[in-house]
């Protein structure tokens, strides 16, 4: 395993997006021209104090007013390293305790990273929440039978579940977890290959379901890049 004490951590804030989708990057949004110019959302919205946006603006898009948690965002510490041909990504976070209790009876907590490719529109700019959730179950006007988009091959979902039944993982992927007080650490390990190789910037996102949340009732990140082998990226996968 990598020596995490020698690897710098990048803090990424995850937020409860409510029922918002790609309308945040439409022409009515003041930052639309910046997105069209190829700049990511974090250029404007990420600050040293976390995400800079008004959480109350999410409320009108939330059909269930009681679903909005008191804690609308929280930080996740992200580290990455390449060791012996394997990419390791480590998430460390303190899940909020005031989220509305969800419907997942089997898992109190879930954490996931999504590794995206160019098939997902706006992946490297805004993050997967702008592209994947507009017509899914739980969204206003969404299809109750439509779940994840994994089968389309547009992104790779690496998920950890706190319950007794482990999440299904792609071949060559392992996950480990630990807990220190109220802080949870999850480490994903994936063999290099396919779209995830040295020299490539891999767009990725984070999703965390807290307090037995299910479906879209999760906290998500904006779009970031994982720089492997010195490639450009907000999170660098250092070689050990």
Swiss-Prot record:
Keyword annotations of the record: Electron transport, Heme, Iron, Metal-binding, Repeat, Transport
Classification via InterPro entries: Cyt-c552/DMSO_Rdtase_haem-bd
GO molecular function: heme binding; metal ion binding
UniProt PTM: Binds 2 heme c groups per subunit.
Binding, heme c 2: 128, 132-133
Superkingdom as given in the UniProt entry: Bacteria
UniProt-annotated binding residues for heme c 1: 41, 44-45
One of the Pfam families matching this protein, by short name: EB_dh
Remarks, miscellaneous: The second heme binding site has an unusual CXXXCH motif.
Name of the featured protein: Cytochrome c-551
Organismal lineage: Bacteria, Pseudomonadati, Pseudomonadota, Betaproteobacteria, Rhodocyclales
């Amino acid at each position: 395993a990598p020596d995490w004490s020698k690897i710098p951590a990048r803090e990424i804030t995850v937020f409860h997006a409510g029922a918002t989708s790609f309308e945040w990057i439409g022409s009515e949004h003041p930052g639309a021209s910046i997105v069209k110019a190829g700049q990511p959302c974090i250029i404007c919205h990420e600050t040293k104090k976390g995400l800079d946006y008004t959480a109350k603006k999410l409320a009108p898009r939330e059909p269930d007013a009681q679903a909005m948690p008191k804690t609308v965002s929280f930080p996740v510490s992200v580290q990455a390293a390449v060791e012996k041909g394997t990419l390791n990504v480590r998430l460390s976070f303190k899940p909020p305790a005031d989220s509305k209790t969800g419907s997942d009876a089997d898992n109190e907590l879930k954490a996931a990273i999504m590794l995206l490719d160019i098939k997902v529109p706006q992946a490297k700019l805004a993050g997967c929440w702008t592209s994947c959730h507009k017509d899914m179950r739980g969204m206003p006007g969404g299809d109750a039978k439509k779940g994840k988009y994994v089968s389309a091959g547009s992104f790779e979902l690496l998920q950890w579940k706190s319950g007794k039944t482990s999440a299904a993982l792609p071949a060559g992927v392992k996950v480990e977890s630990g807990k220190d007080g109220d802080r949870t650490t999850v480490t994903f390990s994936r063999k290099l290959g396919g779209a995830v190789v040295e020299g490539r910037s891999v767009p990725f996102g984070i999703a965390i379901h807290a307090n037995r949340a299910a479906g879209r009732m999760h906290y998500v990140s904006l779009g970031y890049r994982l720089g492997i082998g010195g490639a450009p990226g907000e999170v660098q996968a250092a070689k050990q």
